A protein has these predicted regions:
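A generic local secondary-structure boundary/capping motif
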Residues: 1, 71-73, 103-106, 130-139, ...
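N-terminal non-catalytic cap/leader segment that marks the start of a structured domain
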Residues: 1-105, 109, 205, 213, ...
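C-terminal structural segment of proteins
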Residues: 5-8, 13-14, 125, 139-153
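Catalytic-pocket segment enriched in acidic/His residues
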Residues: 7, 47-54, 61-70, 74, ...
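Short loop segments at secondary-structure junctions
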Residues: 16-18, 120-121, 150-154, 174-175, ...
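Short coil/turn connectors at secondary-structure junctions
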Residues: 77-79, 110-113, 119, 135-136, ...
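A gly/proline- and charged-residue-enriched helix-loop-helix capping module
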Residues: 104-127
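Short, structured patches in soluble enzyme cores that scaffold and shape functional sites
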Residues: 118-120, 127, 134, 141-145, ...
Length: 285
């Protein structure tokens, strides 16, 4: 199933080039009150919502053309955004070779430097666009495969890790280059783009063989395959959960391949991963 959040927080089911409005399925979510849970309510109850959607589509819910809707982040309230710093060998070489990328920061192997966190306030959907936070700096796109955690866990072994994934989407880990810590440079508003929608894990046969592609203004900048990840999705979940409990709705950004490059106000990025969809993201003027 491919589910989007669109327009005014509507829930949509993707069918070809249409979005079926299945917002009514959200009525199965339990009421929640202050203090809010540490997980995303929809992702935590995804199985129940999916069953309700199957019922709903027997009727004749409203349909929209995909081109007519505004796509929001498929996860509304991620508790945390966990990210892999340098997780493709060719990007490690590129980052070490280019002073404009490394800024005298030591670029270590992921096994040694570990993961980092991005502010959840940086998350947006494809249609929300983003504004360059520091126009005085180099700002880069990083296309990444994103796994959305579906089931809570701590110390999850790699062999069971994929059972904790609700689904996958395309991610852009936007980055201000410079000497500061990654968590600061990668957390401005809009610097985590998720979309175009959530593809549930049962629809992804092998997450280790997906093609990634991003074009900026029609020019290919990054083209890679997840088979070249240094630590794959299961290993990243094992690694992350050895430090903290993963919750439903937590976002795992798996790292970017080689080809990162600068973007400017007015640029249009088109990012796609095989089976997960293609999203167009504009950088505000
Ligand atoms: Mn990244």
């Amino acid at each position: 199933m491919q589910l989007c959040r669109f327009n005014d927080d509507r829930l949509g089911l993707i069918r070809g080039d249409e979005v079926i409005d299945v917002t009514a399925a959200l009525k199965v979510l339990p009421p929640c009150s202050y203090p809010l849970p540490k997980h995303d309510l929809l992702i935590a109850h995804l199985d129940t919502v999916r069953a309700e959607i199957e019922q709903l589509i027997q009727g004749a819910p409203l349909r929209h053309a995909l081109t007519d809707v505004l796509l929001l982040s498929p996860v509304a309230n991620p508790g945390k955004v966990v990210a892999a710093p340098v997780n493709y060998a060719k990007h490690l070489a590129e980052a070490r070779d280019d002073q404009a990328i490394h800024h005298q920061n030591q670029i270590g192997e992921i096994q040694r430097v570990g993961l980092f966190l991005k502010a959840s306030s940086s998350v947006v959907g494809a249609s929300e666009g983003l504004r360059i936070a520091r126009p005085d700096r180099r700002n880069d796109h990083e296309i990444e495969l994103v796994a959305v955690i579906g089931k809570a866990g701590r110390n999850i072994p790699a062999a069971q890790a994929l059972e904790h994934v609700a689904g996958y989407c395309v991610g852009l880990d936007m980055t201000v280059r410079g000497p500061e810590e990654r968590s600061m440079r990668k957390s401005p508003d809009g610097y985590t783009v998720l979309g175009p929608w959530l593809t549930t894990a049962d629809e992804v046969a092998d997450v280790g063989t997906l093609d990634l592609l991003i074009e900026v203004n029609g020019e290919v900048r990054q083209r890679a395959n997840t088979r070249d990840l240094i630590i794959g999705v299961a290993g990243l979940i094992e690694f992350a959960s050895s430090f903290y409990t993963l919750q439903p709705g937590d976002i795992l950004m798996t790292g970017t391949p080689e080809g990162v490059s600068q973007v400017f106000p007015g640029d249009r990025m088109v990012a796609q991963i095989s089976g997960l969809g293609r999203m167009t993201v504009d950088i505000d003027d």
